[in-house]
Amino acid sequence: MGTTAPGPICLLDLCDQKLLDFVCNVDNKDFMWLKEIEEEAERMFIREFSNEPELMPKTPSQKNRRKKRRVSNIQDENRDPVRKRLSRRKSRSSQVGTRHLRSKPVTIVEENGFPVLQRITRATAAAAAAAAAASVASASSSSTAGSPTVLTKKAVVEISTSERLSAELQLTKLKGSLPPSPVSQGTLTSEEELTPKKSEAGKLDSVTVNSLKATPQSPKNRGVGEGRSVSKLKIARASWGLQDSPGSTDSPWQERVLSPILLNNILPTTAKSPLGNIRSVRRSLISQDSQVPLASKYNLVAKQENGSRRSSRRIAKKAGKEPEASARIICHSYLERLLNVEVPQNVGLEQEPVEVAEPEEAEEEQEVSKNSGCPSKPRSATKIAISTPTSKPAAAGQTTTVEEQEAELDQTDGHREPPQSVRRKRSYKQAISEPDEEQLEDEELQPCQNKTPSPPCPANKVVRPLRTFLHTVQKNQMLMTPTLASRSSVMKSFIKRNTPLRVDPKCSFVEKERQRLESLRRKEEAEQRRRQKVEEDKRRRLEEVKLKREERLRKVLQARERVEQMKEEKKKQIEQKFAQIDEKTEKAKEERLAEKAKKKATAKKMEEVEARRKQEEEARRLRWLQQEEEERRHQEMLQRKKEEEQERRKAAEARRLAEQREQERRREQERREQERREQERREQERKEQERREQEQERLRAKREMQEREKALRLQKERLQKELEEKKRKEEQQRLAEQQLQEEQAKKAKEVAAARKVLNMTVDVQSPVCTSYQMTPQGPKSIPKISVDDYGMDLNSDDSTDDESHPRKPIPSWAKGTQLSQAIVHQYYHPPNILELFGSILPLDLEDIFKKRKTRYHKRTSSAVWNSPPLKATMVPSSGD
């Protein structure tokens, strides 16, 4: 690059300006986030874990609000906020561009041509933000200097005693396997630094894992454990040479541009692009796989990129086996999940075989998951154990070993979580199960002396908490505010804290300790089994979700292919239709030309035919006129003949009608005479019948009168006999009473004379009540018998009389000749019902009862109806 060229100089000035803007942005925005994270980490270090978690009130409105806001807070920056589905509102070109922006890490090609990947970490970002304000002036001055400088200052990072001891022990183990290399500087990098991206990448700095603490897991649940475990970054002293690094240059541009953002003049391995720095520090903790759309897995470009990544991984594995002078402390499991690439490590095969094998298995599992199209969703976060300058050193008389200190540090770091604003809002089951598992994993590493034994308690009063209670507590813990999330994110196991220990005063301390350890071991085994079961269920659910998403995406892609095929077919059909239309137009033109020629020939023929037709028409018209004249004369002659014939017929008809009228008149006269004679005869018969009936009536009345007189006479005689009988009985009764009174008086005198006692009460039994009737009945009323009333008012409760022997007399008008005459007269002279009663309106039950019921308009009787109702809506039913 020529220094005198104006274009590159302007480009360098533009880069300087952009970089200064980025530094100001980091100072004003990102630094505030880093300060908040640092304060949260300090609170996590110094907080007291024995306090009870503060629970938020759970109201129905809050529950509903939480359910509605389950959308992840961490969304892709390049994603359209309106876009909701993969198959809508995005063309294929925009999707490809978006996929590259999401999945492609930021690379910058240096002057030597090596593409190197670098991302900002928490430590680097915090250091750069802290030194940004102080180094702006030096950056402007160094940009004009233009002389290459070599940065040799070192960054001093204080570490705790346990970390220093573990790092020294690890370095002593690695001295035999690693070749000597100049130690220039110790630095702390995140998992994302120095990851090989393409196959043509040059030599990269190797990585040494000094201390990688992991909970022992079985191969069965190792995949889940790696996806959910919390990584720990231990600080060790590693060195790397600036002069030997392929990415380092001594150009004046690098000195001028990179100096403002370096902490204590530490030159990073590669320059960072502005696009990579725009991403927030909190977003650096989120997996890139979760932001890559699923559609990228089914495209050919994504498959080619996966192949190139696998080849770069193989090259990185080979390069990782070569010894290098510099080393980094990187948590491989989190780095591989975050970047989806292999990270080479420089650990000897003979040292720490288990720790080296686990990342390789994770790499294989990750490759399988990539090939299957199901990206994992790690929830782990990088944990950096950095001691503050005010932290106290460990006591000289410390009795715990280095391993116990590291275990305690792991337990403390294991409870750290990103702020609640960064964490993705989880569902109900995830909020219950995930914190419980992470808490139990951390509690397994806690020492036993932290447990405070509960007071002795009978076994029947021990409360065995259910699993739902722990889940409820963990769910409430996840629903707290961001300020309380750090204090309440850790909870002691309810079983470990509250389960009482059996205290036997007869046993020794050793026996008690052994029993306690045995019970603790059994509880840990039970918790481990439960945790494994929960992890298995979670893995199965994740697999089901992945399969559903793949199936849905496959259907979407198939639908797109079908739509494209339909478009192609429609396009072909349109082209064929246009071709057919063109052919039809050509044929129509040819046909029109032929038709014109044919019309000309036919026109001449038609003119000739028309001339001949006119001549023939004139001849036919003349013949028709002649024939019409002849026909008219013939019709006139026929009409005259017809009129004469009609006149003759009319005269004959008149004579015949006169004869018929005369005959009818004679017949009518004879009929009237016969009717008169018949009427006279009937009148005579009627009079004779009336006379006979009157005679019979007179005789019957006379007979009835005689019968009544006889009945009255018999009744009088009966009454007279009854009166005589009554008088006779009364006389007998009176005589009996007198005789009885005389006897009683005689007896009373005899008793008084015999006893000579005064004031005696005598009971006299008088037979008067039975001797005669106390209230004699009066004369019975004689019923009045009338000829015309049929005795309707007498004994109305009697049953029907026998027709052959009726008890009551039948009136004369209801029997005999009077009844037959009345029937004959009514038959020949029927009464006019309309004149007598008027027009009878049909009954309407609604008017009668002042109600409306549906059954009024229905026939509900069981009768056989042979005719339809006259008025269906008005005729009442007989069943009502």
From Swiss-Prot:
Q: Which family does it belong to?
A: Belongs to the INCENP family.
Cellular component GO terms, alphabetically? central element; chromocenter; chromosome passenger complex; chromosome, centromeric region; cytosol; kinetochore; lateral element; microtubule
Q: Which GO terms describe its biological process?
A: chromosome segregation; mitotic cell cycle; mitotic cytokinesis; mitotic spindle midzone assembly; mitotic spindle organization; positive regulation of attachment of mitotic spindle microtubules to kinetochore; positive regulation of mitotic cell cycle spindle assembly checkpoint; positive regulation of mitotic cytokinesis
Keywords attached to this entry = Cell cycle, Cell division, Centromere, Chromosome, Chromosome partition, Coiled coil, Cytoplasm, Cytoskeleton, Glycoprotein, Kinetochore, Microtubule, Mitosis, Nucleus, Phosphoprotein
Q: Does the keyword Protein biosynthesis apply?
A: no
- GO MF assignments: molecular function activator activity
Q: Where is the composition biased (Basic and acidic residues)?
A: 194-203, 563-596, 604-617, 630-713
A Pfam family of the record is INCENP_N
Instruction: Tell me which residues are glycosylated.
Output: N450
- Taxonomy, superkingdom: Eukaryota
Q: Where in the cell is it found?
A: Chromosome, Centromere; Cytoplasm, Cytoskeleton, Spindle; Nucleus; Chromosome, Centromere, Kinetochore
Phosphothreonine is carried by which residues? T149, T189, T195, T215, T270, T382, T452, T800, T860
Q: Which residues carry this modification: Phosphoserine?
A: 72, 142, 147, 190, 218, 239, 245, 248, 251, 259, 284, 290, 376, 421, 454, 488, 796, 799, 861-862, 867
Question: What function does this protein fulfil?
Answer: Component of the chromosomal passenger complex (CPC), a complex that acts as a key regulator of mitosis. The CPC complex has essential functions at the centromere in ensuring correct chromosome alignment and segregation and is required for chromatin-induced microtubule stabilization and spindle assembly. Acts as a scaffold regulating CPC localization and activity.
Q: Where is the composition biased (Acidic residues)?
A: 352-366, 434-445
Q: Where is this region: Disordered?
A: 52-104, 175-229, 303-322, 350-461, 513-541, 563-617, 629-713, 775-813
Q: Quick one: where's region SAH?
A: 506-733
Residue ranges annotated as compositionally biased, kind Polar residues, are 207-220, 385-402
Modifications made to the protein after synthesis: Phosphorylation by AURKB at its C-terminal part is important for AURKB activation by INCENP.
Q: What is this protein called?
A: Inner centromere protein
Relate the assembly described in the record. Answer: Component of the chromosomal passenger complex (CPC) composed of at least BIRC5/survivin, CDCA8/borealin, INCENP, AURKB or AURKC; in the complex binds directly to AURKB or AURKC via the IN box, and forms a triple-helix bundle-based subcomplex with BIRC5 and CDCA8 via its N-terminus. The reported homodimerization is questioned as the SAH domain is shown to be monomeric. Interacts with H2AZ1. Interacts with CBX1 and CBX3. Interacts with tubulin beta chain. Interacts with EVI5. Interacts with CBX5; POGZ and INCENP compete for interaction with CBX5. Interacts with POGZ. Interacts with JTB.
Coiled-coil residues are: 506-759
UniProt region (IN box), positions on chain: 794-868
